[in-house]
């Protein structure tokens, strides 16, 4: 199982090709390609490469599937004995990113077609 740890949208995520992830809104049109070059770690066939802080020449490519909103978070402020109450809600804007491949120095080390054949062979 190959994976990479990336930094995107102010978060660090463990990503694998063929899976989708919800990250903070990116401002890119849906169905467009997106390349992330802030790769912190790559694990390929038990060969681990750690960057300082990023792995040189490593990129993770994906496709923006859609933009959506997260679950509503309720913020409730109350001052006791003062009859002061505020109830607010917040929904975070998210982008759904489908990871297609992990590349190092321009060569693909793993892509989603390789992951699909692995899962079909196991069945």
Curated annotation (Swiss-Prot):
One of its GO terms (molecular function) is structural constituent of ribosome. GO terms for biological process: translation. The keyword RNA-binding applies. The keyword Ribonucleoprotein applies. Keywords: Ribonucleoprotein, Ribosomal protein, RNA-binding, rRNA-binding. GO terms for cellular component: cytoplasm; ribonucleoprotein complex; ribosome. This protein binds to 23S rRNA in the presence of protein L20. PANTHER family: 50S RIBOSOMAL PROTEIN L21, LARGE RIBOSOMAL SUBUNIT PROTEIN BL21M. Part of the 50S ribosomal subunit. Contacts protein L20. Belongs to the bacterial ribosomal protein bL21 family. This is Large ribosomal subunit protein bL21. It comes from Rippkaea orientalis (strain PCC 8801 / RF-1) (Cyanothece sp. (strain PCC 8801)). The lineage of its organism: Bacteria, Bacillati, Cyanobacteriota, Cyanophyceae, Oscillatoriophycideae.
